Amino acid sequence: MAHPASNLPPVLRPEHPPVRALDDLAARFGTSTRGETDGVTLTGVTLATADLRPGEAFVAIQGVNRHGAEFAAQAAEKGAVAVVTDAAGADIAAGSGLPIVIVDSPRAVLGDLSAWVYGTGADDELPLLFGTTGTNGKTSVSHLLEGILNQLGVVTGLSSTAERHIAGQVIVSRLTTPEASEFHALLALMRERGVEAVAVEVSAQALSRHRVDGLMFDVAGFTNLSHDHLDDYADMREYFEAKLQLFHPDRSRRGVVSLDSSAGAEVAARSEVPVVTVICPAIAADPDAAADWTVEILEERQDGTTFRLAGPDGRSLTTVVPTIGRHMAANAGPAIVMLLEGGYAWESFVAALDGGRIEAYLPGRTERVSGERGPAVYVDFGHSPDAFEKTLAAVRHVTPGKVLFVMGADGDRDATKRLDMGRTGAEGSDIFIVTDHHPRFEEPDSIRATLLEGARRAGTPTELHEYSPPERAILEAVKLVGEGDAILWCGPGHQDYRDIRGVRTPYSARELSRRALRDAGWPVPEPHWPVPYPDDDTPLSDPTRDWR
């Protein structure tokens, strides 16, 4: 797959969108109108004036600080044919010269409205949709779904935190789950290009904020639940209830639920659609829980994890997931079962996978960025205590020497997990380096101090270090390890920027790691990820070079 040259997501629209009448839109979704709507037609909808194309309707919602209707005149200049907004927005947009359709809640109606505009609703002819939710593993399951489907000869689409794919074309991703208008346009484009099945990562926020409204998932998957996102939700119960929404007949037809976390049993019990269950006893909270399918870990190596998937009627296959970690095998098993529930024949999985391996690339998910010699260096997107615990255990299992852990925490995000993040990092490593991640508008010194306090509370003999610049952190990390040792850098994963006081600066933990190894004299592979830095041989440690 070719990576995009720009790190800005493109505006994606179907090449041949349906033409809809504004009067029909108003009749279906509106409570009233202002201005002349007769004879007005539209070919798309968007929330963002920056993405608006001529002939589209601009949907204006109330934001945190401003109402989107304040940009109605700008939308008109870019060729918008109408504004869809609430009563307050209609008053603000009155001077734009555009006809206005008033709805009770533009955010709540956007999904169904977009599905109607693009013909991507539950009753329309679409690719099969596989949606995965859970705290950890959503991205991995989505990429594994895509990889397995490709091995079955299926033309695929993907929407994940890391990337979006349309039949092999790679597109930059910014949100785990795109806004509803963007997603329905993407799905319509995928349909035009012959995509037969789509793997979708569905966040709790997407469910709460109506981003997947108007979609019908053929199969929904649940991975696990652990401490995260309490900046968005009052408590873990509210967070759980948000994810449970995916298992409702308005959103999915069938479900596959992992019982590895204690929340899985409740999802299975309360699901309003038929579900089958999967368990990996090697990592499950209750390894004796009864499930329809079982993932048995057979071998863990640096080049992959071998597992056996066994289920009803004596069905069984043995294959390899191409990353380290029992938790990755625990992601792969449900991915296979989701596809089976989607209608693909068991015999096709046996032919493609049994005795072989899953061919999937998981960007920034326990991704090895080092060469064959020297310390093994892995970069991961994990940013929760549970993710740290599982990933550190995976690295420890395949590492004969020391394990060095590098991490930072997001600013302006759930701060209640930081002490546990620090504690888990110290418990799972021999050397622990705390650095900066996305400080956003928080003081990075304060973030690091909390992480280090958590590390000290672990009471382990772990060697602790603190370096504010990530560039310095990885340089020092490489100095502290050698052949047979491993570095795990958690947090950045696939990301190509850092957010510092609202400014996104080019950044790649994968490339920084590769160059730090190169500067230390270790052989390194060529990058197979976008490189946001100058492509030259200047050492990372050169004081004249500002890599940030």
Regions found by a protein language model. Name each.
Residues 44-45, 79-86, 200, 255-258, ...:
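Short, hydrophobic beta-strand segments that form beta-sheet elements in well-ordered domains
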